[in-house]
Amino acid sequence: MHPINAVVAARMLAGISQSNALQSEAIPFGSLEWITYAGISCFLVLFAGIMSGLTLGLMSLGLVELEILQRSGTPKEKKQSAAIFPVVQKQHQLLVTLLLFNALAMEGLPIYLDKIFNEYVAIILSVTFVLFVGEVIPQAICTRYGLAVGANLVWLVRILMVLSYPISFPIAKMLDWVLGHNDPLFRRAQLKALVSIHGEAAGKGGELTHDETTIISGALDLTEKTAQEAMTPIESTFSLDVNSKLDREAMDKIQARGHSRVPVYSDNPKNVIGLLLVKSLLTVRPETGTLVSAVGIRRIPRVPANMPLYDILNEFQKGSSHMAAVVKVKGKSKGHPSTLHEENSGESNVSSNNSELTAPLLLKREGNHDSVIVRIDKANGQSFISEAGRQGFSHTSEEIEDGDVIGIITLEDVFEELLQEEIVDETDEYIDVHKRIRVATVAAVAISSLARAPSGRRLLGPKGSGGPKTPKASSTPKPDDKLMGTMTGPPQGNN
């Protein structure tokens, strides 16, 4: 039984002893005074029911839920939530106001029922009406239609809050000080759980597909993942020596890899000094034996291994570079480890106020797009960062320069972590470098399933028996066959 109902019953029992002792005369049934007392009793029961329903209905509406309805609900829901929001913001004052007037109605009910009914009848009626009319029915209605009921009665709530202000406001402030305010926002883990619950795979009626839930979860996890988790290890990266020749063999390897950018190293593959844009080789003739150093080599930015992927993505999307060398910083540093470093030939590096990176990936393109950016004689371990550019960095340029290159990270690597799936194109040799799953394996499975498919769904061969026959493939290899899936070198992830 509700505590207030127990108080009502106790008062009615106390009224029995008092009436028996005083032998007071009951008010005649049907008289004006009886009708007045009966009307007041009915009003108190209904008023108590409204207060009880509003307490449950309004207090169950969270601030986040109301903001969501204001932004994405129907026009009716937007109007209702906008009307309720200012009242629900004062949660403790609203709670004290509703409970105060609910208690007043419950306390006043026995006083009037005792004057118009027999004591035993008054107890039965009081408990019954208070339980069903004052508690069960209002709360059941407001649980389902709390938004609509609250919006229609918000004017009454405002009046009651003004009337009870001298009492409710001090108590509400005390509750705010003691209990504090509830945090209406969700944490990252809670958002991921909420998204997964709304997915179709959860079987709870959600509309989000598996791809949608996967991408949203990947976006939430991206801030916690670092460059080392997404990079391609330097041992598995295809790169070129700066002193090597761009002969036919080298050009065939570059073409077979199918990458748009190739890291360039000096002496040691871990000593990455820049990157080569493959499109700059269009004018290079293999028979001339041009050195890699004679082609436009662009500087490659360096990032610490523990740099968050969101910081890398923010710099990649500026368009200056889509590849960076991941460096394992030797020195220990304080603060957030998100520093991006690049080798600069004389220019002053400028740091953006909105970025924790040391400098933009490329500050300036000298001349045309094929101009040489890196000076080979100054590329080994030197740094040209101004004092202004060093301010506010977690890692100094010297620490990054002295660090060992452990891998290469590209924009595609970041997207794969975002999508949580491997991106495979027609030139990739491996689906997953770490698991070493070859693309050819997947292609063989696809061809096998295609061969078992009905003739109407096959991509090769005539649709009908009367059509032209498909010519047999020649057993003699073509000159370009060695470029298609014959590379057995280490896997690579630098696109």
From Swiss-Prot:
This is DUF21 domain-containing protein At4g14230. Residues 231-291, 296-356, 357-426 form the CBS domain. It comes from Arabidopsis thaliana (Mouse-ear cress). Residues 64-92, 142-146 are cytoplasmic. It is a multi-pass membrane protein. It is found in: Membrane. Residues 456-477 have a biased composition (Low complexity). GO terms for cellular component: cytosol; membrane; mitochondrion. GO terms for biological process: magnesium ion homeostasis. Keywords: CBS domain, Glycoprotein, Membrane, Phosphoprotein, Repeat, Transmembrane, Transmembrane helix. Its main location: membrane. Glycans are attached at N349, N353. Residues 330-354, 455-495 are annotated as: Disordered. The chain crosses the membrane at residues 43-63, 93-113, 121-141, 147-167. It comes from the Eukaryota. The modification Phosphoserine is found at S352. Residues 1-42, 114-120, 168-495 are extracellular. Residues 30-212 form the CNNM transmembrane domain. The gene is CBSDUF2.
